[in-house]
A protein has these predicted regions:
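Short helix/strand-capping connector loops at secondary-structure junctions
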Residues: 254-262
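Short acidic/polar mixed-charge low-complexity motifs
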Residues: 15, 36-40, 204
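ATP-binding pocket architecture of kinase catalytic cores
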Residues: 20-137, 141
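A general structural signal marking secondary-structure boundaries and capping sites
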Residues: 68, 111-118, 155, 180, ...
Length: 283
């Protein structure tokens, strides 16, 4: 732990009084740190394993700071020996005590922020997987070429998908324009599950660990439903501000394919049957 104290004291110019590991942190070590004048979260990993990961996270946090959500402030960022690190303000997570209404309001306003293209000016990460964000004019092109195809290839190379699965995905791509309604690009969190929405000391919903890009807004909502639930109050408030297209819940599985492929890549075969079920449903 000495190198961690060295980093903190180098950047904060104060002696560390408290240092403890936080829950979570599958990819990075995450630690809570206190000095006389600072209360921060330190995220740290090996720079060679995840090149520029914290650069990308910082870019995402800055982009999300234009939304109504509270976003952790970036205090310091850099490298030390073999380590890459990001120092953020510490937000004491109160769990899910934020109001469902406020979550719906903030999501609708975030998704109202738009761009001329789907994607982002630079690539980033989702979890530990590099995420390609090359700009596209249509969501269909972006979703197929930048989201599904790269992960399908990785899973095939890992022997987690076979040639039969690949053929079914190729058939699915031909059906997507009949299933997904056209919409303008929306600013997305990109990795929106309940663990990345925390409640601050004022019970305000706060976003962490982004994988941002401009995409179809049903991506964020579909991911929330995949690994949790969305209250009726959240959806009602969202719809009052930015009404969703009809039958959006019926096609969430199409947009859940991407996070399921991410999990198949990272965690293995328990995610294969849900993927095969969705692809088979539409082909």
């Amino acid at each position: 732990m000495k190198y961690i104290r060295d980093i903190l004291e180098l950047e904060l110019k104060e002696e560390v009084n408290k240092l403890q590991r936080c829950s979570g942190g599958n990819i990075n070590d995450v630690l809570e740190c206190q000095t006389n004048n600072f209360h921060v979260a330190l995220k740290i990993n090996e720079a060679e394993k995840f090149p520029k990961m914290f650069d990308k996270e910082a870019e995402g946090l800055k982009l999300l700071s234009s939304t109504p959500f509270r976003i952790p402030k970036i205090l310091k960022q850099g490298t030390f020996q073999k380590w890459s690190y990001l120092i953020l303000e510490f937000i004491n997570d109160k769990g899910s005590s934020y109001s469902d209404k406020k979550l719906g309001e903030n999501l609708a306003k975030m998704h109202s922020i738009t761009s001329n293209h789907f994607g982002l000016e630079s690539d980033n990460y989702i979890g530990s997987i590099p995420q390609q964000n090359s700009l596209k004019k249509s969501w269909l092109s972006f979703y197929i070429e930048m989201r599904l195809q790269p992960l399908v290839k990785i899973c095939f190379d890992q022997n987690r998908l076979n040639k039969g699965d690949i053929r079914l995905f190729e058939k699915l791509y031909l059906e997507l324009d009949k299933i997904i309604p056209k919409e303008a690009p929306a600013l997305l969190h990109g990795d929106l599950w309940q663990g990345n929405i925390i409640s601050d000391e004022y019970s305000e919903p706060t976003l962490i660990d982004p994988a941002v890009y401009y995409g179809h807004r049903e991506m964020d909502l579909s991911m929330l439903l995949l690994f949790g639930s969305i209250s009726e109050q959240t959806i009602e408030t969202y719809n009052d501000i930015f009404p969703l297209e009809k039958k959006w819940k019926e096609r969430t599985d199409i947009h859940q394919l991407y996070p399921l492929l991410v999990h198949l890549t990272l965690f293995g075969e328990s995610y294969l049957k849900p993927i095969q079920g969705i692809v088979g449903k539409y082909t």
